[in-house]
């Protein structure tokens, strides 16, 4: 092969690698509850690349389906803040109700469902008009919030009432109240919308609810040698898109449980930072990021090997986490 051909081939390979890296580039946005900031991590470099200020006590964070905006629950500011995803600049606040903690954007990007912990309601905001279209009475201390992929139901979990409240997304009416174990924190639907997973922090379980019968069909429990039951506290969860594997944050147990979604058996416990709270995949599900509130860091986990790759220092009390694609 001639020298010019070699150079051309090398240049093509470099260009291809650059395109691939760009296509797979993501940034991890982490809300720091005590610092009132967002830390942004380069998902390839696994390093914080910038930090910026937001409202008071930021917790829930998510991106719009089109990735043009991101939303932050500034709980002590009683606001959901809207930012430009390209510049990280604050745009405006949405009328969120008191103490917004978690929220979920409808799959069509039109509505935002917000759990208001202090006044026991779910607030629904039209994202185009920026107006409240409904406030729905739910149980005491609502926290978890999810919307089914088919956009038929929203669910709010109430920590003190110990229920998952199913809400019809067209009528904004509660259509069922499903009892679960003590202090339900987080909810996730399977990709086919047939099952709802709810984590119970104090109960130490994850309930799997059949959406057809609206009853708890099975439960997952956890057993970690050397740890007492009271420190094993399921909170944030993520389910793979193929509905084969669940990753469950276990709070002060400092571990993420990896669960086979068919057998509901724990395949592995991954040791991470202290008081692991919420989780987020990269879009291709190759990496999983965990927020560790007490150790003030984020753990990056290789999903293929189920091993932690790096611990990344962020702000104080990291809480929520969301992924942004870089165009």
Describe the role of every protein-language-model region.
Residues 4, 12-327:
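Predominantly soluble domains enriched in secretory-pathway, periplasmic, or organellar proteins
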């Amino acid at each position: 092969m001639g020298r010019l051909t070699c150079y051309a081939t090398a240049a093509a390979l470099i260009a291809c690698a650059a395109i691939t890296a760009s296509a797979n580039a993501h940034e991890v946005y982490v809300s720091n509850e005590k610092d009132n900031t967002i830390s942004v991590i380069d998902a390839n470099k696994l390093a914080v690349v910038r930090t910026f200020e937001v409202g008071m006590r930021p917790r829930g964070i998510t991106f719009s389906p089109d990735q043009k905006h991101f939303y932050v629950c500034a709980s002590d500011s009683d606001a959901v803040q809207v930012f430009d995803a390209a510049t990280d600049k604050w745009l405006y606040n949405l009328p969120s109700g008191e103490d917004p903690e978690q929220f979920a954007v409808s799959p069509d990007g039109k509505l935002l469902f917000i759990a208001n912990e202090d006044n026991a309601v779910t607030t629904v905001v039209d994202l185009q008009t920026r107006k409240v279209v409904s406030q729905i009475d739910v149980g005491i201390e609502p926290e978890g919030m999810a919307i089914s992929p088919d956009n038929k139901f929203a669910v709010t979990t109430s920590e003190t009432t110990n229920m998952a409240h199913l809400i019809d997304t067209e009528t904004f009416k509660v259509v069922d109240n499903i009892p679960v174990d003590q202090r339900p924190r987080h909810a996730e639907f399977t990709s086919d919308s047939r099952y709802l997973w709810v984590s119970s922090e104090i109960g130490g379980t994850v309930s799997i609810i059949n959406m057809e019968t609206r009853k708890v069909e099975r439960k997952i429990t956890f057993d970690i040698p050397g740890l007492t039951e009271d420190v094993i506290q399921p909170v944030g969860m993520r389910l793979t898109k193929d509905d084969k594997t669940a990753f469950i944050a276990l709070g002060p147990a400092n571990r993420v449980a990896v669960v086979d979604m068919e057998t509901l058996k724990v395949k592995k416990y991954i040791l991470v930072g202290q008081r692991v709270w919420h989780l987020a995949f990269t879009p291709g599900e190759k990496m999983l990021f965990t927020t560790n509130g007490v150790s003030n860091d984020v753990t990056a986990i290789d999903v293929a090997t189920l091993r932690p790759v790096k611990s990344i220092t962020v702000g104080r009390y990291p809480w929520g986490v969301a992924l942004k694609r870089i165009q």
